[in-house]
Amino acid sequence: MEYRIERDTLGEIKVPADKLWAAQTQRSKENFPIGTEQMPLEIVKAFAILKKSAALSNQKLGKLSEEKAEAIVEAADEVIAGKWNEHFPLVVWQTGSGTQSNMNVNEVIANRGNQILKEKGSDVHIHPNDDVNMSQSSNDTFPTALHVACVIAVENHVLPAITKLKETLVEKVTAFEHIIKIGRTHLQDATPLTLGQEISGWHRMLEKTERMIAESNTYMKELAIGGTAVGTGINAHPKFGEMVSEEISQFTGKQFVSAPNKFHALTSHDEVVYTHGALKALAADLMKIANDVRWLASGPRSGLGEIIIPANEPGSSIMPGKVNPTQSEALTMVVAQVMGNDATIGFAASQGNFELNVFKPVIAYNFLQSAHLLADAIVSFNDNCAVGIEADEEVINENVNRSLMLVTALNPHIGYENAAKIAKHAHKEGLTLKEAALQSGLLTEEQFDEIVDPKKMIAPKE
């Protein structure tokens, strides 16, 4: 491998000749050989959006020449397009402010910008600190990139995935609204409801958590940029934060604003905790839905077997003909990961000391992992399971007819204690509920048939 010599304030260091990064990136690469978790490319691209917006703002403020600004913007656009992904090699486990990743972006954009200028015959030189990082600090750029990346992940991936599954569930609610099944509480038989009603509960969960996520995400649209090192805005124009936020908004189509208090924006990540908490709420509901699906599909002959799920792949390497609820299993594993990520984010966000929190990279990594896992898992569950759910009406009807909990309808007519005696007698003697009721002498066959009608038990009545 061929190398070139780069220099920084610590001296000279060898850098691979074909890479756009420079000394500080190389030092980080050598000093932190920890794990395989790379800084998410979403953070890199959010940084590039920020650097582009900063260059345009500094140009408008008369602090950066038009020639340099144009080269920085062009280089940043290439980074955003993914042209230089291999030039961002750093891992998450680095300085807690994300300084090395900020410098990685500064160095790549500066070197690529200089190539662009050279191709145009210019001898102007872009410096990674003085030009690309002008009016900025790692302390305000990393939280800005973090918020931009997380907002995009939530709005472009998580929320559309929820909408897709919601639409499928609405179709199932309508398709199954006539199918009366036995309800279950504590994993025990309860009073009846329709399969459509049961699924409507799932739909409402998604509808509610979707709104919770969207509402919490508004706080993530406050950006730290303009606070520089400790929140005072030293070395930045007073309007810089506002101008950059407007540029980022125009480029992303998201309504970002300059954070009203930069001291808070650098040392606290409560917005991330709040939004990820909403993602955790979604995850909790998805766990419930996935579990319901696999319970209801259990069988085929020794389980509940009230719904049929698509047979996507052989279920066992030893038991032929087995169909497992694999989409539910994948989704519940994602939920477990999200729950763990939430614990990490909550702890990391509690570690702000004085003017800075230095757990930023791990917060970014875990949030983005949660967002993408949830989005992918929801779409997979929808496409490979939910859309193909069918009701086994024969099994459902059999379970309803065998249930002793229909006795609940007798409570207003013969009292709770008498109804309980009938249910216990039926269970002990192996009788149907009707047979036990008639043996009690408390009501006639006509009265029983009139009262114990599942169709009359699925909604309130006067």
Curated annotation (Swiss-Prot):
Q: What terms describe the molecular function in GO for this protein?
A: fumarate hydratase activity
* InterPro entries (alphabetical): Fum_hydII, Fumarase/histidase_N, Fumarase_C_C, Fumarate_lyase_CS, Fumarate_lyase_fam, Fumarate_lyase_N, L-Aspartase-like
Q: What class of enzyme is it?
A: lyase
* Active-site residues annotated for this sequence: 186 (proton donor/acceptor), 316
What positions belong to coiled-coil segments? none
- One GO BP: malate metabolic process
- A GO term from the CC aspect: cytoplasm
Tell me which EC number(s) this protein carries.
Answer: 4.2.1.2
Q: In which pathway does it act?
A: Carbohydrate metabolism; tricarboxylic acid cycle; (S)-malate from fumarate: step 1/1
**Top-level taxon in the UniProt lineage:** Bacteria
Q: Which UniProt keywords apply?
A: Cytoplasm, Lyase, Tricarboxylic acid cycle
Q: Where is this gene product found? A: Cytoplasm
Binding of substrate occurs at 97-99, 127-130, 137-139, 185, 317, 322-324
Q: Which catalysed reactions does the entry list for this protein?
A: (S)-malate = fumarate + H2O
Show which residues form the site (Important for catalytic activity): 329
PROSITE patterns membership: FUMARATE_LYASES
What more does the entry say?
Answer: There are 2 substrate-binding sites: the catalytic A site, and the non-catalytic B site that may play a role in the transfer of substrate or product between the active site and the solvent. Alternatively, the B site may bind allosteric effectors.
By sequence similarity, the record places it as follows:
Belongs to the class-II fumarase/aspartase family. Fumarase subfamily.
Function recorded in the entry: Involved in the TCA cycle. Catalyzes the stereospecific interconversion of fumarate to L-malate.
Subunit annotation: Homotetramer.
Q: What is this protein called?
A: Fumarate hydratase class II
The protein's organism comes out as: Bacillus cereus (strain ATCC 14579 / DSM 31 / CCUG 7414 / JCM 2152 / NBRC 15305 / NCIMB 9373 / NCTC 2599 / NRRL B-3711)
